[in-house]
Amino acid sequence: KKNSKKISNKLNKIISEINETKTYDNKTTIIIKRLLQKELPERLRKKICRKIFNENFRTSEKKIAKEFYLNLSEIKTIKRYGNEIGSHSFNHLWMNSLNSKKQLSEIKKSLQFWKKNKLINKKWSFCYPYGGYHRTCIKNLKKLGCSAAFLVQNKVNKINEFKKFELNRVDCNQIKF
């Protein structure tokens, strides 16, 4: 009974956030994404995702990832053509759902990868996964030498409202193709 009330509260919270979310996903899709991204316990999320994957794909996660995600060589090519590479955390978790220690771990692991592969500059940026952050995350980014961080607000940045750790960016899910 206690768990069902907790889940009900989470669903109500997600539903109230949906009205503020500007995306082309329908409400059901947004609810399912939020549950699988952060609201359910991590072990349960992984179990559900693995089951969904195995029921819908007749290949390994590794093969899917190889086909749909950039590999190191492709990322180096992007960098060579003058693009900046920033951090986005290591496991793509909602930063506002993590404590300070876990945030630092996520950011540091990501930076280690980028530095090891010579893909990040001294002045590096960070993009909050899903746009989720809080003040502790900003403090941690500053502590690690980050120069700027991006939200998912689907807005234009205004010079008179410039906050370098709360810069707007457009999420690809907010663009109709």
In which residue ranges do the predicted regions lie?
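Residue-level signal for the start and early helices of compact helical domains
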Residues: 23, 61, 76, 86, ...
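Alpha-helical scaffold elements lining the catalytic groove of polysaccharide deacetylases
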Residues: 67-84, 91-119
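Extended, charge-rich helix/loop segments that form flexible
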Residues: 1-81
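Short hydrophobic-acidic sequence motifs that mark active-site Asp/Glu residues
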Residues: 84-86, 166
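C-terminal active-site subregion of NodB/CE4 polysaccharide deacetylases
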Residues: 1, 6, 97-177
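Short beta-strand segments
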Residues: 53, 86-89, 124-130
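Residue-level signal for pocket-adjacent positions within structured domains
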Residues: 65, 90, 162
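Generic signal for short, ordered secondary-structure residues
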Residues: 31, 57, 89, 119-120
